[in-house]
Amino acid sequence: MSKPIQMERGVKYRDADKMALIPVKTVMTERTEILRKPEWMKIKLPADSSRIQGIKSAMRKNGLHSVCEEASCPNLAECFNHGTATFMILGAICTRRCPFCDVAHGRPMAPDTNEPVKLAQTIKDMALRYVVITSVDRDDLRDGGAQHFADCISAIREKNPSIKIETLVPDFRGRMDRALEILTATPPDVFNHNLENVPRVYRQVRPGANYEWSLKLLEKFKEAHPDIPTKSGLMVGLGETNEEILDVMRDLRRHGVTMLTLGQYLQPSRHHLPVQRYVSPQEFDEMKEEALAMGFTHAACGPFVRSSYHADLQAKGEEVK
């Protein structure tokens, strides 16, 4: 039996190095079929990238991270060019190693106690009115990072009194009650936690997570704050069927979730899970109709939709696809 790899704190493991640490492996070979992207998946880059560079510079200046960059989001150019970003707190190294995700794995450093203040000032400088705060998984922390979320929310509101805050939280595995006790004392305006995909493929797609646990997290927050919207998102193209997606949507409604995002999974590198199908815009439209019929008040469904894609418009109920 081989010895476990001793990871050095603060070192990022990506691509092949990260995938080598995953117990349930998908082995990619030269014979593995790579699906060609359909026309509707082609992205047009903005002609002027000055705003993009400005946001990147503001992030670097204050030692902050965006999930847009760390997870290689396909919407980065569009969102940055519109002056929006999803901030990723608690560092850029995740204690999980999901094979669909491009965020680095490893042993993260201790949380930056100055991050809440730096984040609040950056948001004020950018004159944002709606902000999404997410994080890597921090299984190394006793509260999973919940107190750091609360500190960030408080600091942001102190400097930006009229801002709306959406949190996209991890599952707080083994720490749910402790985390919820902290977060219910300093709640966001929207509470988001992604299920990512259907339970049948969880062991391969989301190792270390539990489908029922994630549903319970969403339900418990909603019970504590019935007036605050809860939200969840899924990726399609990882081996699930449309009927399985509909079943997950029904589960979300049974657990009080009212906001939904559905988007196409895209393979970050050849080392990550391959795309098994591309879902057409028409199918996404049909899923949105099903979601609204189930009672979701907001449903953003489309090939490029991501959990925080135009989150401000999603929260207003405007169409996003």
Swiss-Prot record:
Top enzyme class of this protein?
Answer: transferase
Q: Molecular function terms in GO for this entry? A: 4 iron, 4 sulfur cluster binding; lipoate synthase activity; metal ion binding
Q: Where in the cell is it found?
A: Cytoplasm
An example Gene Ontology CC term for this record: cytoplasm
Q: Which SMART domains match?
A: Elp3
Which pathway does this chain act in? Protein modification; protein lipoylation via endogenous pathway; protein N(6)-(lipoyl)lysine from octanoyl-[acyl-carrier-protein]: step 2/2
Q: Which cofactor does it need?
A: [4Fe-4S] cluster
Keyword Transferase in the entry? The reply is yes
* Amino acids binding [4Fe-4S] cluster 1: 68, 73, 79, 308
Query: EC?
Result: 2.8.1.8
How does the cofactor attach, per the note?
Binds 2 [4Fe-4S] clusters per subunit. One cluster is coordinated with 3 cysteines and an exchangeable S-adenosyl-L-methionine.
Which residues are in the Radical SAM core domain?
80-297
Q: Which UniProt keywords apply?
A: 4Fe-4S, Cytoplasm, Iron, Iron-sulfur, Metal-binding, S-adenosyl-L-methionine, Transferase
- The entry marks the following residues as binding [4Fe-4S] cluster 2, namely 94, 98, 101
Catalytic activity from the UniProt record = [[Fe-S] cluster scaffold protein carrying a second [4Fe-4S](2+) cluster] + N(6)-octanoyl-L-lysyl-[protein] + 2 oxidized [2Fe-2S]-[ferredoxin] + 2 S-adenosyl-L-methionine + 4 H(+) = [[Fe-S] cluster scaffold protein] + N(6)-[(R)-dihydrolipoyl]-L-lysyl-[protein] + 4 Fe(3+) + 2 hydrogen sulfide + 2 5'-deoxyadenosine + 2 L-methionine + 2 reduced [2Fe-2S]-[ferredoxin]
Among InterPro entries, the record links this protein to: Aldolase_TIM, Elp3/MiaA/NifB-like_rSAM, LIAS_N, Lipoyl_synth, rSAM
Predominant place of localization: cytoplasm
State the PANTHER family in the record: LIPOYL SYNTHASE, LIPOYL SYNTHASE, MITOCHONDRIAL
Family, as annotated: Belongs to the radical SAM superfamily. Lipoyl synthase family.
The name this protein carries in UniProt is Lipoyl synthase
Cite the source lineage: Bacteria, Pseudomonadati, Pseudomonadota, Gammaproteobacteria, Enterobacterales
